[in-house]
Amino acid sequence: MEQMIFIRKDDKVEVFSEEEELKGSYYRAILEDNPTKSGHNKLKVRYLTQLNEHRLAPLTEFVDQRFIRPVPSEDVNDGVVFVEGLMVDAYLKDGWWTGVVVKTMEDEKFLVYFDCPPDIIQFEKKKLRVHLDWTGFKWIRPDNKELVKSVFSCGTMVELRFDCAWIPVIVIKELEKDKRFLVKYWNKSYSCRESKNLIVDSLRLRPMQPPLSVGKYELLDHVEAFSGFEWRQGVVRGIVFEGRYMVSFGATKEASQFNHSDIRPPMEWEDGVWHKRTKPKRQKETSLDGNRNVQTKEPPGNEMADDVKKESGLPITLGVTATKNKTQGKVSPVPMKNGFGNESTREKMPEEPKIKYYTRKRKRGGLKLNSYINKTVLSSDRTPNVVKNSASNAEENHAKHTIMVLPFAKKSPVWKTYESLEVFKSVSHSLHFSPLFETKQDFREGYAIGMMVTYFGLLEKFKDLEADVPVSQLNSLKDSFSELEKHGFNVTTPLSRIDKLLALKDRQLYIMEELKGFDKEMTNEFSKAKQEFDDMEQKILEVKHKIIELQRQEAALKEQKEAEKEQKDAAWKKICQMESCAKDLNVELEDVEFEFETILSAPW
């Protein structure tokens, strides 16, 4: 038989709040009046977690008896499985709020929906308890709620379109009119408790994009990157290391670095189905020297490089700028940004198969390849030795000619291997190795190859750095990159990052000094507090000893009092006996006097 529960004065209770902002919540209190049998009178309670308007003492008020209930048992969750639809009480703002579990998360966390006001908040299991209704003398557990599941049902993670980005949000509830939804911003790194609620149209919402397994992204791939709590459309501009990419957004050429896990391919949600985003259309086609087609487009992924591979037979994308010679009607090669051209300077190009180059149209005179392709490296079985720069025509900044001569001939096959690496092609180099003119001819190519090996080794060494790297090692790396820069290596990015790391190390050193100061101060404060605590403990101990002594004296006095009381009782008893004897003597004395008078008054 279920045991009935009754509450009495001085019991801990929970009080239901009717205030608009606190409606639906229970707060702990001490009952300061005994309940009445009728249940109509208001009872005085003293809250344990709420203060009065002056915030100096616990809040006390008179509450209807029907809003007061006992405190549920501590083991109320024993044997209860937390599932979607379970009614629970969540500990929030110093009280227990009634809600419904709408979604189970990882690590024993749950999303709880509250009806008044409408909201969804994430809680750990230790902050939840199963909801029970109080009948007046016993607890009753209500049935689980039946949740209706849909694409945009309560507790569903969706994405909200904002300008050109998609922001993760969570659906709180569907409003009755106009197919609108109440949502709030959502991020798995925090509980979204303080997020602002928004009312949005259903056309701006879509489900969370399903995860796609992408091995790696290539240069110029159109992607979406997670930046500032939103998915933004961008283009891969560089591959830093395996699993890390440089992505730019919009018209700007500035790129930011992202992990592979923070990048996804763009997709579109149409008619309840996910589709891959269609490729950008070709815009315009022109002719270059009658034999070469130039097309304007923004190619997705590495489609541009694949077209060149298929039609020209070259292993990688060409990285030259093609210009039209106005006087001769011929095409002359312009050197790439890394300083490599063809084997020798040529005034006329030999007959070649028709090749398509993807490019943008120039504002004045001539056409050039897409600037993004210029960052790639020309692969050839024959290594260049002399490079000639040529401007397109007199209409463009006047014609200038510069000749760059390498101090050696590239004979080793390792050049092709190094120059084809993505980490080398992703940055524009102007390798000239001019300091090698001061060395012997036989050693120059070996020195240059050694510098290539050193360059890649330094990049790997930089990648493997850890937070506790000494400043001397960073300075050594900086000096090594600076030495490579003298030979034409583009080390702007590594040097910039090393400078940032050095600045961070200075900041780290400053913070460590601050921490040492704080540690010393905390140690002193702790020692001071410990001494004060020990002194207080000693005083308490002394007071306890005094209390014990006083208690001993009190006990002795009580014993003495009892003894004196016994003596007093004995004395009183003796006095009573003496009074009785005195009375008897007085009677006897009166008898003597009476007899004396009788004798005197007797007749003769």
Swiss-Prot record:
Keywords assigned: Coiled coil, Growth regulation, Transport
Record's keyword annotation contains Transport: yes
CDD domains assigned: Tudor_Agenet_AtDUF_rpt1_3, Tudor_Agenet_AtDUF_rpt2_4
Keyword RNA-binding: no
Residue ranges annotated for the DUF724 domain, each copy included: 405-603
InterPro entries, A to Z: Agenet-like_dom, Agenet_dom_plant, DUF724
Superkingdom, natural source: Eukaryota
Tissues in which the protein is found: Expressed in flowers and siliques, and at lower levels in leaves and stems.
Annotated spans, Disordered: 269-308, 327-350
Coiled coil (residue ranges): 520-575
Function: May be involved in the polar growth of plant cells via transportation of RNAs.
Designated name of the protein: DUF724 domain-containing protein 2
Name of the gene this protein is made from: DUF2
